[in-house]
Amino acid sequence: MNLYLIDGHSYFYRAFHAIKNLSNSKGVPTNAIFGFTNMLFKLLREKKPDAIAIVLDSPVPTERHRIYEEYKAQRPGMPDDLVSQIPHMKKIVEAFRIPSFEMPGYEADDILGTIAKKAAAAGVDVFILSGDKDMMQVVGGRINIYDPMKEVLIDEAAVIVKFGVPPERVAEVMALTGDAIDNIPGVKGIGEKTAKDLISCVCSLDELIDHPEKIKNERLRKMISENIDTIRLSKTLATLDTGLQVEVDMKNLTAGKPDWPALQKMFSEFEFTSLLKLIPAEGHKQRASYITITDKNALTIFLGLKG
C-alpha cells in the first residue's frame, strides 16, 4: 500500500508562481487554483495512490516562533491574490475527497513527518510531495520525497549526496549553514560544503562542539566555539518534531471517488474549460432547465465552457 502526502501551502505557492495573470471574466484571480487542480489531476491519474492526504500550515504561531522571535520573520506577506484563492483550493481538495490535516500551533512539516513515520512503521510506502529541504530528515526506508512538477524522486541515497550525511543528520548540517528561507541563523561564513565536511567527520554535532580540537582549521574552530548557542538554537529550529499526537488510520486516508458535480460547478464558475473536459461523462450534472443568452460576451464565454 502507498500513501501520498501533499504539503498544501508549498504547492499553493508553486502553483501561484507557475502561472501568471489568470482570472475569470469577472476578474477573480484563478491562476493558483488552476495550477493546483491540474497537479491533483496529474497525481491521481498517473500515480493512482492507494491513500492520500494534504497537510496545511496553521496561522497560529508555533513553538519555533516562541523560542526565536525572528523565525521566518523576513518572509514577505502572502500576496493578496493568493490569499483570496486559498479557500477555493481547500474546497477543491474537499471535492476531490482528499483528507486534510491542520493543527493550530504546528507546522505542516512536523505533521507531514509524523504521519509519514507512523504510516511507514505500519508497512506503508510513503511519498511526500514537498519542495522543502527540511523534509529530507525523514527520508529513508519506506519514505521518499516526490516532486510531481519536476518528476523527481528523492530517496535516502539522494539525501546523502546532497548533505553528505544520512537523513537523520540533515538538521546538524542546517545548524551550521542556517536556512535563509526560514530565517534560521546558523554560523555566518559557513556554507553547505564546509558544513557537510565538518559534520561528516564526527559522530554528532555535540561531538563537534565538545571537541573543537577535531577541527583542524583554526578559523573554523574559532567560528564554532564563538557560536555554540546559535548552533544549538539553529539545530532545534531545523529539527522536525515527528512525535505529534496525530491519529493515522489508513482506512480514513483511502482515496475516494471525487464529488464530480461539485467540481463541475467550481470549474464552470472559474471558467476552466480544459478541466471540465477531464470530468467523466457520468460525473456531469444533467441540467433540467435551459437558459436564454442575449449578450454577445456571455455567449462567447458560454461557448468556451461548452467547448
Where are these regions (language model features)?
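Generic detection of long, well-ordered alpha-helical segments
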Residues: 30-33, 79-83, 227-228, 256-260, ...
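Noncatalytic, basic helical substrate-engagement surface that gates or grips nucleic-acid strands
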Residues: 1-129, 133-155, 230-233, 239-247, ...
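A short, flexible N-terminal coil/short beta segment enriched in small residues
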Residues: 73-76, 262, 300-307
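A generic alpha-helix structural signal
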Residues: 33, 37-40, 86, 90, ...
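Non-catalytic nucleic-acid-binding/docking modules located in mid-to-C-terminal regions
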Residues: 48-53, 96, 121, 142-144, ...
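Charged, flexible boundary elements
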Residues: 101-111, 279-307
